[in-house]
């Protein structure tokens, strides 16, 4: 299994876990969060800020494993987000279509996913 120290879920995690186990699609919906910049967006600086967020925030370094029928968790010492895709949308219809598809894509916490980050440029040229 793993040589890491495993922890039981706390009550609020247990509620979310039970929602995923007993829901129709076995997942919790993605919560779309975006920040729009009309000037001065630096991909490298933002990627470094996200890396720092993952380093300092324990919940972004959680990893889940099954031990028998019970799901447990442990903390990874280091976590890296990798390369962040950058998209450019020509029309609002194209952008909203992508957002609808992205929102429906499940985050698989058992594979270590905690968040999906995408850089984008909207049709007016603003960076997100």
Give short role names for the model-derived ranges.
Residues 8, 47, 54-128:
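Acyl-thioester-dependent condensation/acyltransferase catalytic cores
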């Amino acid at each position: 299994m793993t040589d890491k120290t495993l922890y039981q879920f706390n009550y609020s995690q247990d509620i979310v876990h039970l929602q995923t186990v007993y829901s129709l699609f076995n997942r919790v919906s993605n919560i779309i969060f975006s920040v729009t910049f009309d000037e001065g967006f630096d991909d490298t600086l933002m990627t470094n800020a996200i890396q720092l967020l993952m380093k300092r925030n324990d919940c972004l370094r959680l990893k889940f494993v099954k031990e028998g029928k019970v799901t447990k968790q442990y903390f990874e010492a280091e976590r890296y987000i990798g390369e962040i895709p950058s998209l450019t949308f020509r029309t609002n219809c194209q952008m909203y279509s992508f957002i609808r598809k992205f929102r429906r894509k499940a985050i698989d916490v058992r594979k270590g996913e905690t968040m999906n980050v995408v850089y984008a440029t909207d049709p007016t040229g603003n960076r997100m």
